[in-house]
């Protein structure tokens, strides 16, 4: 590890108790990426590897989510060599402390340490982890930090590793992801500022929010029970109807906001586990 100044002595906070996402905000377009920083060296930044691919003969490019600098790309020089210390450290779904240098879009990794304290993902949880990583790559612009999203990703991996129901964990993560990247998810009030009623039917306008179901709504907008919207607001998925309708709603919203671009891991989840 490098000995740069300003190292964070406690890079990863303990995951908070699970619960409903934060307060609602008006729907808006995704934020633009933050201007590239002028910092040449960053030391001991909490991070997770989202994806990696070969770079030249012996190196890797790693796409990482960091707490304070957002999603960035780093060159891990020599990481493919048989005896490289980085080979066993740069793993997905494990908390890391990374250091790097450079001002270009592709920076140079200068140090990496495994923080530890997290169980490995396996089975369905592993598939869900790859799905979460793909969503982060698709929705998070480079160098656009989202500390609350970083923390919720940590919580999501922890919940998956401890065997919590994947359906509930994924729906909660999807909502936080959309909110933090600019797509608010107001579920307890309609666009007319009326409270959602559990016994009524609604549709979700991707650009405006919850609307009363009616003949003027496009046919491809899913019809959702008010009870489902209220349950999602409270992160409560014990009703079978809520499980089914929340999956339909989130699939519709993610597909809309991605412009129809398919998610490879979503199709795997649909085919294997219907998550």
Swiss-Prot record:
Key words of the record: DNA damage, DNA recombination, DNA repair
Tree of life domain: Bacteria
InterPro entries: ARFGAP/RecO, DNA_rep/recomb_RecO_N, NA-bd_OB-fold, RecO, RecO_C
Region (Disordered): 1-38
GO biological process per UniProt: DNA recombination; double-strand break repair
GO cellular component terms given for this protein: bacterial nucleoid
Keyword Transcription: no
Pfam families: RecO_C, RecO_N
Biased composition (Low complexity): 8-24
Function as written in the Swiss-Prot or TrEMBL entry: Involved in DNA repair and RecF pathway recombination.
Family: Belongs to the RecO family.
NCBIfam families: reco (TIGR00613)
HAMAP family: RecO
Name this protein carries in UniProt: DNA repair protein RecO
Species whose genome carries this gene: Burkholderia pseudomallei (strain K96243)
Lineage: Bacteria, Pseudomonadati, Pseudomonadota, Betaproteobacteria, Burkholderiales
Gene designation per UniProt: recO
């Amino acid at each position: 590890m490098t000995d740069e100044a300003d190292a964070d002595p406690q890079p990863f906070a303990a995951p908070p108790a699970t619960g409903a996402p934060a307060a609602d905000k008006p729907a808006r377009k995704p934020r633009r990426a933050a201007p590239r920083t002028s910092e040449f060296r960053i030391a001991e930044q909490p991070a997770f590897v989202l994806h990696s691919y070969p770079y030249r003969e012996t190196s890797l490019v790693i796409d990482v989510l960091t707490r304070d600098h957002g999603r960035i790309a780093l060159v891990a020089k020599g990481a493919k060599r048989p005896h490289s210390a980085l080979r066993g450290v740069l793993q997905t779904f494990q908390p890391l402390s990374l250091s790097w240098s450079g001002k270009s879009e592709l920076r140079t990794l200068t140090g990496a340490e495994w923080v530890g304290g997290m169980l490995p993902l396996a089975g369905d949880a592993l598939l869900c982890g790859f799905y979460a990583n793909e969503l982060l790559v698709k929705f998070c612009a480079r160098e656009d930090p989202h500390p609350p999203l970083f923390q919720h990703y940590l919580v999501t991996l922890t919940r998956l590793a401890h065997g919590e129901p994947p359906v509930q964990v994924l729906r909660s993560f999807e909502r936080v992801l959309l909110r933090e990247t600019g797509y608010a998810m107001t579920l307890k009030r309609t666009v007319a500022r009326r409270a959602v009623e559990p016994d009524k039917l609604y549709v979700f306008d991707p650009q405006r929010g919850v609307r009363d179901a009616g003949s003027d709504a496009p046919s491809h907008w899913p019809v959702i029970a008010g009870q489902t919207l209220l349950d999602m607001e409270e992160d409560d998925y014990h009703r079978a109807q809520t499980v089914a309708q929340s999956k339909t709603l989130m699939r519709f919203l993610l597909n809309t906001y991605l412009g129809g671009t398919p998610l490879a891991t979503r199709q795997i989840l649909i085919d294997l586990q219907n998550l």
